[in-house]
Amino acid sequence: LMLDLNRQGPHALVAGTTGSGKSVLLQSWCLALASMNGPEHLNFVFLDFKGGSAFRKLERLPHTVGSVCDLDLAHAVRALRALEAELTRREQLSAAVHASDIRDMVNPPPRLIVVIDEFHALKDQLPDYVNRLVRIASLGRSLGMYLIACTQNPMGQVSADMKANMSVSICLRVRDRLQSCELLGDGRAADLSPAMPGAAF
């Protein structure tokens, strides 16, 4: 599987029920990106809303500039505010050199990928902060900020404004055909075998 977030994205929505291989997919994806890009060119921020276990191994990467979980909501709030501040900083950097895209800058800041596991939990616990992510989804591409939002249940979790900017959808095994239809437009992801974790459309 070859996937270029810059060309095919800029943002991605990943869905899969427990045991579908979602966490392993995320880890493999991030490791592949890290192996092809040095930390001076690519950074990660991880927001883990299922107890902090999903990205523990990735926290040691030199690319990782932030990692928070739902066990410390105050820390998560600070991280979301910091992401919004970083978006504003990049807007100012681009404006200062009259660049419409950070690729046009002589010394652009590293690409920043924000990976959110259990997006539905973030939405439930910090609903007032979801709009900050919508702004990143709307403006992030030209500023080098990307979102990978993951959830067990994709039904109604992402607003229309946010979904409009999420060009990449990956659906592993989900619980029912309605959830599959939400992401794919048909029910085939509900028919994936539990014996094949990692299989996806």
Q: Would you name each region that the model predicts?
A:
Residues 191-201:
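Conserved AAA+ ATPase small/helical "lid" subdomain
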Residues 1-193:
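P-loop NTPase catalytic phosphate-binding loop
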